[in-house]
A protein has these predicted regions:
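Basic, helix-initiating cap at the start of DNA-binding domains
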Residues: 1-21, 25-34, 51-54
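Short hydrophobic clusters on alpha-helical segments that form packing/core surfaces
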Residues: 10-18, 64, 68, 89
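Short hydrophobic/aromatic patch on the recognition helix
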Residues: 35-46
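Hydrophobic alpha-helical connector segments
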Residues: 51, 55, 68-95, 148
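Amphipathic alpha-helical packing segments from all-alpha helical-bundle domains
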Residues: 62-65, 110-152
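Secondary-structure edge/capping motif, primarily at the C-terminal ends of alpha-helices
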Residues: 71-75, 103, 107, 162-166
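Helical hydrophobic small-molecule/effector-binding pocket
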Residues: 80-104, 113-121, 130
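Amphipathic C-terminal alpha-helical segment
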Residues: 91-95, 131, 149-169, 181-190
């Protein structure tokens, strides 16, 4: 049995199984077996399968935001931080095999968590976008009011509907798009 509060092994096991067999085919029993714990422990620590999916999605979102912040921090200007933050977010989700499997899942819960119940996820992303774009500045002044929310909603839209008219297939495409459209919202024209 894991120490109280250490849900990492459970979430790791669930994440692996979601990637291997998909969310619909993963059971609490499978997760418990992979985590080498009793099935009751999963229910006690996490809850239902829906709670498990939510917990995995929340943890992966947090990990993604940390990686995006680290990539943005390597840049020297606010404009480059904003552009690389944008491009890294989309590229990281698109290239993560488990997240791809979750996006492609037939699970109505995943779809719900990415659309109608995405507010908690979006708020976290908006706060992270504001922090990244603000950089060393202490104020929340952006070129366009509500710019971090607009940017996150654009990212969200691109992830849910990858293809339209703008070329957004490669990291360089994403950077160019960000410099044309995202940077002016956050930091003004460069």
């Amino acid at each position: 049995m894991q120490p109280d509060g250490d849900d990492g092994p459970i979430l790791d096991a669930a994440l692996e199984l979601f990637g291997e067999v998909g969310i619909p085919r993963t059971t609490i029993g499978d997760v418990a077996k992979r985590a080498r714990i009793n099935r009751v422990t999963v229910y006690r620590r996490i809850g239902s399968k829906d709670d498990l999916v939510r917990a995995v999605m929340a943890r992966e979102s947090s990990r993604l935001l940390v990686a995006v912040a680290a990539a943005a921090a390597e840049q020297t200007s606010r404009a480059d931080r904003a552009a690389h933050g944008f491009a890294t977010t989309i590229d990281s989700v698109r290239t993560n095999p488990v997240l791809i499997k979750m996006f492609d899942s037939e699970s109505s819960l995943v779809l719900e968590q990415l659309t109608t119940n995405a507010s908690a996820l979006l708020v976290s992303a908006i706060n992270a976008a504001a922090h990244i774009a603000r950089g060393e500045l202490e104020s929340d002044t952006f070129a366009v009011p509500d710019a971090p929310e607009i940017v996150v909603r654009v990212v969200h839209s691109i992830l849910l509907t990858p293809s339209a008219t703008a070329p957004l297939d490669t990291y360089d495409d994403l950077l160019a798009f960000a410099h044309r459209n995202i940077v002016p919202l956050l930091v003004g024209t460069t």
